[in-house]
Amino acid sequence: MDKKVSFTSSVAHSTPPYLSTSISWGLPTKSNGVTESLSLKVVDARPERLINTKNISFQDQDSSSTLSSAQSSNDVTSSGDDNPSRQISFLAHSDVCKGFEETQRKRFAIKSGSSTAGIADIHSSPSKANFSFHYADPHFGGLMPAAYLPQATIWNPQMTRVPLPFDLIENEPVFVNAKQFHAIMRRRQQRAKLEAQNKLIKARKPYLHESRHVHALKRPRGSGGRFLNTKKLQESTDPKQDMPIQQQHATGNMSRFVLYQLQNSNDCDCSTTSRSDITSASDSVNLFGHSEFLISDCPSQTNPTMYVHGQSNDMHGGRNTHHFSVHI
């Protein structure tokens, strides 16, 4: 005999949400004449869908109680007229319902300890089991509370730390230069031979003497920590380097003119300037630019002073040409 099972759902979206489900069943004996019922209540746990509920009722009844099931289904449909709902009715064979009842009875019989006592407890006091379904709904974007989210355990590889062995440094290979390998092995063999003969090994000299260390601390260092060159440091502090090059040559030329004036002061009898004097004066002219000097000669009766104007120009093919005008 077929049994009619009605399924009523008031879900607005097709995507299965997070569900909180409770199942209660009562399995009375057939002698009492009470209908066997199995109800499954599915509650939508979303905040905006807490008002809407899902009721799934499975009723197992005889042909005489078909009218009452039809009335109950009509009541559920009338109560859900305000919200859009869908109602699905299908037929289930009696063998499937009987198999479900037998599996539930066996489970409770194992928990109680004896099969007869477990079946009696089921008939006397109907039990209730609660469980929840976790569905990954991507449409909410993580707005669900933490209680409804699946608790996934993530193992970080940095969280687990393994202690290192104590003899790790001793067993590790030492990488040395290929050219120094033979000398290192020779010294180690010689040291091992002396230790086997119980001979005293001389104390090794320190890597750096203390005086050298103190001297290194006193030496000036640059920004990168390297030692500065003292010669370059002295050249940078030399005051002559601060003067421009033309000014240095001008001071040298002035000293030459003073020497020429002293030489001419010894000859007091001269009244005119010879050609050789003019030539010597031309050598002392500044070769790097235009200059004008005043030279005082020895006093004479006709010309008490002598003016020498010198001009040099090195722009003509790299040769030095001199132009002088002597006023007596």
UniProtKB/Swiss-Prot annotation:
Keywords: Activator, DNA-binding, Nucleus, Transcription, Transcription regulation. Residues 205-230 bind DNA. GO terms for cellular component: CCAAT-binding factor complex. GO terms for molecular function: DNA binding; DNA-binding transcription factor activity. It comes from the Eukaryota. Gene3D superfamilies: 6.10.250.2430. The keyword DNA-binding applies. InterPro entries: CCAAT-binding_factor_CS, NFYA. Residues 54-86 are annotated as: Disordered. It is found in: Nucleus. A motif (Subunit association domain (SAD)) lies at residues 175-198. Residues 76-86 have a biased composition (Polar residues). Expressed in the whole plant, except roots. Its main location: nucleus. Stimulates the transcription of various genes by recognizing and binding to a CCAAT motif in promoters. Belongs to the NFYA/HAP2 subunit family. PANTHER family: TRANSCRIPTION FACTOR NF-Y ALPHA-RELATED. Heterotrimeric transcription factor composed of three components, NF-YA, NF-YB and NF-YC. NF-YB and NF-YC must interact and dimerize for NF-YA association and DNA binding. This is Nuclear transcription factor Y subunit A-8. It comes from Arabidopsis thaliana. The gene is NFYA8.
